[in-house]
Amino acid sequence: MSVSVETRDLSISFGTEPNAVKVLPGVSFSVQPGECFGLVGESGSGKSTVLRCVSMLTDFWKGEVLIAGKSVRDMPLIDRCRILQMVFQDPYGSLHPRQSVRTVLNEPLVIHKLGDREERMRKAITDVGLPVSFLDRFPHQLSGGQRQRVAIARALILEPSLLLLDEPTSALDVSVQAEILNLLQRLREERGFTYIMVTHDLAVVDHMCDRFAVMLRGEITEILPRQAIAGNGATHDYARELIGASLEYEGAH
């Protein structure tokens, strides 16, 4: 089932007053059920921080985050983990090096007291395009792309409605990036997931997202449809510059 997401005046500071640094001064956006919504901008613009706030990995923010109209702060942890999952940037750092794929996938099933564990693990691993035999492999026996597929399988195994994707392909080779993006696209079409995707790459946005927000110094400068990329339909100076630079790069390659 798809869910909507809404942030209202989401703000967060790091450090103590009077030297606290405001990383997000007040971010507001909404995501429709089944939509893929992108967050783009330069490094340090607050994109990943937004995901950490939405997921409650960072919990000392102010404002509101609503999923299907319910505040994430009011959701019990066990319920929140069933609704949303996150896929991280580094497939080499997101899996425990001494745990087999079977252990990685079984752990959330044990925590949530779900039955049919073997069947669920087999389905999760084959859904991401890996054979069942990979359940008995360890991370060092997998390529970067295979590790990221396992990370996606771990996110899928609790059957969430919302996936938070923090640059899920940036650490991978170009050919593998395309495979992972196509996998994510297929899964969204088949299951109706809602995605919020952080990326530096506007080509990824063009391939994956319905709309995207351009962030600068913790603020959203503009929210645009995917179609605005090809003709650089942005109105904010920074957004136009960012899209223009991406188009020039793509044209040169």
Where are the regions a protein language model picked out?
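The feature captures the beta-strand-to-loop junction immediately N-terminal to the Walker
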Residues: 40-42
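Conserved ABC ATPase signature
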Residues: 138-142, 146
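ABC ATPase NBD coupling module
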Residues: 17-18, 71-85, 99, 111, ...
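Conserved ABC ATPase "signature" region
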Residues: 118-133, 244
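Conserved ABC transporter NBD signature motif
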Residues: 63-73
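Helix-to-loop junction immediately C-terminal to a conserved catalytic motif
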Residues: 55
